[in-house]
Amino acid sequence: MEHYISLLVKSIFIENMALSFFLGMCTFLAVSKKVKTSFGLGVAVVVVLTIAVPVNNLVYTHILKENALVEGVDLSFLNFIAFIGVIAALVQILEMVLDRFFPPLYNALGIFLPLITVNCAIFGGVSFMVTRDYNFAESVVYGFGSGVGWMLAIVALAGIREKMKYSDVPPGLRGLGITFITVGLMALGFMSFSGVQL
């Protein structure tokens, strides 16, 4: 149990997808203008990562891994295609659920919801799961923790950006300039967790 708790804390804070690996930055920067929208997208990313990482673990372990289906057959060259296919299917299901039950959030996320399919934070979580050789339980914890870490980062950035609307930012830094500086400072803050040994 202790191993899973340390993996969860590590994936949320120490190896944060957005602020340590800088994955998923396109939606991270574009949607982080309002806390409510950022939280909605963060929940969507948590759901997709929590489901996509373990499902892709099963696909990799039982189909793609060497000797998984047939002795002597290695289908690992199909990793990227299979993983993206699973992620795309999950995002389509999530999009239908949001459209049916949460129309305001669906409309607020707009084009960024289908872009979760190609969000490199999602694919990065799946790729890290394969390279680190996580088992099914570890992949569930890692997927959930990575999603929560990404959501924490985007909600924090949205909160800061909402406050910055009322501040006197120099004209040359308005817009993305001050946002990049803010993200860099947040990344430095999260980098302080890298010395923590779990």
Curated annotation (Swiss-Prot):
The chain crosses the membrane at residues 11-31, 39-59, 77-97, 110-130, 140-160, 176-196. One of its GO terms (molecular function) is oxidoreductase activity, acting on NAD(P)H, quinone or similar compound as acceptor. Keywords: Cell inner membrane, Cell membrane, Ion transport, Membrane, NAD, Sodium, Sodium transport, Translocase, Transmembrane, Transmembrane helix, Transport, Ubiquinone. It is found in: Cell inner membrane. It is a multi-pass membrane protein. It catalyses: a ubiquinone + n Na(+)(in) + NADH + H(+) = a ubiquinol + n Na(+)(out) + NAD(+). Its EC number is 7.2.1.1. It comes from the Bacteria. NQR complex catalyzes the reduction of ubiquinone-1 to ubiquinol by two successive reactions, coupled with the transport of Na(+) ions from the cytoplasm to the periplasm. NqrA to NqrE are probably involved in the second step, the conversion of ubisemiquinone to ubiquinol. Composed of six subunits; NqrA, NqrB, NqrC, NqrD, NqrE and NqrF. This is Na(+)-translocating NADH-quinone reductase subunit E. It comes from Vibrio atlanticus (strain LGP32) (Vibrio splendidus (strain Mel32)).
